[in-house]
């Protein structure tokens, strides 16, 4: 049997090893100069004025919601077809997640669904740039501006994604992920971009105990050695070890995403003759980062269920993923919102399957996946 082909594998090389070695030898391994360099590099990528590195995108979502003073009695609009951390952070702050449906074929939350869910209690909108493609963010921001509601972009899948010529996050507030399967990774990490100076200042406080400065600030700039707590905060800072890896990966971003695009094109060409349905691309001008390549496996159309397909691929030494099981169908949220019905989300949640997609995949690896799909489709 061939070696197991995982759904994802981080693309690490000698450059990342050298970056870690440099930090270890520097004597400063926690938050410091590599964090600052990463934040500056991200501002150059997205065009934002501020970037705040954090220990995870979940941490970034938590403190962004906190900085916007979202809490008990507030509502936050978000798709159900997303990673549960967003719903969890909303709920942990005492607010109510208002889950809305997505477009059946792009899996993007639509401006129409968002606007129809707005109430006097709506405090924020969290659209998801799904699988590496952009949501229609201009239209969504216009809704936010019209109603005076904050828009927080979930850009966990969108490092290297462009919308109408602008990198995701530009002129707004967005949260990126550097988790192990993401387009660039440092194992665990995240980053928030914003043009709102007051928000950026609050985020920096909240990510580090509510202090106005961190240890590197105090040592480097000669600030007061005993910083004051300005507001209760968290320990969500990113170490320089992680930041150095992320910074090295960011330099490689164009190469990494180009390889992802090549594999995606290989899949697209092969799937044209198969019953498995890939996602449709958004109609607006964009550059896809191809974080995920997703097919829909409809048993009536394909002759096999999604779960059976995933198991059959596993038996052939091929890993897959599920992004995502709809949040409102999971125990806690199902019991909290028992009457919620989101037909497009539910249809897709039962059928979506993420195929292997990572930069170190070879053409032969992709061919192996395609051959297995052809066999399982009876071709």
Swiss-Prot record:
CDD domains: AHBA_syn (cd00616)
GO molecular function terms attached to this record: pyridoxal phosphate binding; UDP-4-amino-4-deoxy-L-arabinose aminotransferase
InterPro entries assigned to the protein according to its UniProt record, in alphabetical order: ArnB_NH2Trfase, DegT/StrS_aminotransferase, PyrdxlP-dep_Trfase, PyrdxlP-dep_Trfase_major, PyrdxlP-dep_Trfase_small
Keywords, comma-separated and alphabetical: Aminotransferase, Antibiotic resistance, Lipid A biosynthesis, Lipid biosynthesis, Lipid metabolism, Lipopolysaccharide biosynthesis, Pyridoxal phosphate, Transferase
Leading EC class: transferase
Metabolic or biological pathway, per its Swiss-Prot or TrEMBL entry: Nucleotide-sugar biosynthesis; UDP-4-deoxy-4-formamido-beta-L-arabinose biosynthesis; UDP-4-deoxy-4-formamido-beta-L-arabinose from UDP-alpha-D-glucuronate: step 2/3; Bacterial outer membrane biogenesis; lipopolysaccharide biosynthesis
Pfam family, one: DegT_DnrJ_EryC1
Catalysis: reaction(s): UDP-4-amino-4-deoxy-beta-L-arabinose + 2-oxoglutarate = UDP-beta-L-threo-pentopyranos-4-ulose + L-glutamate
Chain positions found as N6-(pyridoxal phosphate)lysine: 182
Biological process (GO), any one: lipid A biosynthetic process
Necessary cofactors: pyridoxal 5'-phosphate
Its EC number(s): 2.6.1.87
GO CC terms in record: membrane
Annotated function: Catalyzes the conversion of UDP-4-keto-arabinose (UDP-Ara4O) to UDP-4-amino-4-deoxy-L-arabinose (UDP-L-Ara4N). The modified arabinose is attached to lipid A and is required for resistance to polymyxin and cationic antimicrobial peptides.
Subunit description: Homodimer.
PANTHER family: TRANSAMINASE (PTHR30244), UDP-4-AMINO-4-DEOXY-L-ARABINOSE--OXOGLUTARATE AMINOTRANSFERASE (PTHR30244:SF41)
Family label: Belongs to the DegT/DnrJ/EryC1 family. ArnB subfamily.
HAMAP family: ArnB_transfer
Protein name as annotated: UDP-4-amino-4-deoxy-L-arabinose--oxoglutarate aminotransferase
Recorded name of the encoding gene: arnB
């Amino acid at each position: 049997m061939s070696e197991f082909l995982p759904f994802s594998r981080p693309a690490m090389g000698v450059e990342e090893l050298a970056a870690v070695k440099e930090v270890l030898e520097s004597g400063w391994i926690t938050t410091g100069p590599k964090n600052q360099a990463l934040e500056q590099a991200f501002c150059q990528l997205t065009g934002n004025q501020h970037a705040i590195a954090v220990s995870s995108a979940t941490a970034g979502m938590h403190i962004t919601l906190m900085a916007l003073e979202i809490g008990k009695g507030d509502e936050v609009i978000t798709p159900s077809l997303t990673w549960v951390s967003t719903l969890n952070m909303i709920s942990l702050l005492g607010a109510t997640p208002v889950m809305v449906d997505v477009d059946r074929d792009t899996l993007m939350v639509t401006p129409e669904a968002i606007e129809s869910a707005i109430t006097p209690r709506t405090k924020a909108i969290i659209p998801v740039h799904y699988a590496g493609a952009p949501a229609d963010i201009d239209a969504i921001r216009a809704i936010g501006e019209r109603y005076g509601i904050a828009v927080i972009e979930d850009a966990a899948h969108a490092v290297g994604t462009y919308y109408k010529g602008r990198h995701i996050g530009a002129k707004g507030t967005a949260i990126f992920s550097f988790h192990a399967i993401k387009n660039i990774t440092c194992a665990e990490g995240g980053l928030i971009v914003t043009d709102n100076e007051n928000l950026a200042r609050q985020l920096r406080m909240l990510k580090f105990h509510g202090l106005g400065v961190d240890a590197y600030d105090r040592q480097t700039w000669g600030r007061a050695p005993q910083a004051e707590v300005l507001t209760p905060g968290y320990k969500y800072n990113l170490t320089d070890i992680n930041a150095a890896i992320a910074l090295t990966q960011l330099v490689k971003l164009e190469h990494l995403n180009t390889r992802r695009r090549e594999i995606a094109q290989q899949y697209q060409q092969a799937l044209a003759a198969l019953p498995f349905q890939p996602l449709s691309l958004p109609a607006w001008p964009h550059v896809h980062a191809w974080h995920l390549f997703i097919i829909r496996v409809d048993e009536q159309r394909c002759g096999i269920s999604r779960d059976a397909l995933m198991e059959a691929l596993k038996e052939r030494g091929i890993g897959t993923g599920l992004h995502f099981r709809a949040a409102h169908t999971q125990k806690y949220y199902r019991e909290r919102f028992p009457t919620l019905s989101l037909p497009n989300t539910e249809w897709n949640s039962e059928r979506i399957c993420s195929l292997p997609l990572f930069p170190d995949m070879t053409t032969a690896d992709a061919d192996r996946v395609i051959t297995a799909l052809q066999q399982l489709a009876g071709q």
